[in-house]
Amino acid sequence: KGISLDVEKGQVISIIGPSGSGKSTLLRSMNFLEKPNKGKITFDNTEFEVEKMTKKDILDIRKYTTMVFQNYNLFKNKTALNNIIEGLLVVKKMNKEEAEKIGLELLKKVGLEEKRDFYPSQMSGGQQQRIAIARSLAMNPKVILLDEPTSALDPELVGEVLKVIKDIASEHVTMVIVTHEMQFAKEISDKVVFMDNGIIIEEGTPLQLFENPQNNRTKEFLKRYIQRS
């Protein structure tokens, strides 16, 4: 099945659709956590043919993209601050003082300055996800990929994570988000993509997709969502 998706600089794109529709697979294939079978990826005017990509090509793409996972994926034996700066020290070879300065600024940005020396086990799920988002920002990526960032959270913790993502979006950071939070997708996105059965069924602005969907499958999905909420 073929998929074609354009992401412009500074855009926030939300990918919605039923479970098992291929949303996360599409997201993970953007930075080669899952390798696409064939096709082309164009990044910053550089075109890559998937079948011919070398390890260096894949590393180059990963340098400019960061991923925020459902289950945070923090290092359990590192503090909040050390989780954030790990990539700066190991990948970017930054000196510790400079890395910590960036890390502390990002802790402030996600509202967790007081948690700098806390370990993941001492923090709530919402706090851990905010640290994971700060870690992804530390690498100064060109694109942040977020895979259902609130799906593992207790309902009362969802809001704090969505607020952080909204704040980042307001700074025109390019983001692609897989989400089941429809109201959030409606508010934050420049473009919403509806997927089902491994293909893109419909895409458009939030107004187009939520208020005036053209495809019957999109209408059916959104109708169920409205009934549930």
How should each PLM-predicted stretch be described?
Residues 1-206:
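ABC family nucleotide-binding domain
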Residues 203, 207-229:
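C-terminal boundary and immediately downstream tail of ABC-type ATPase nucleotide-binding domains
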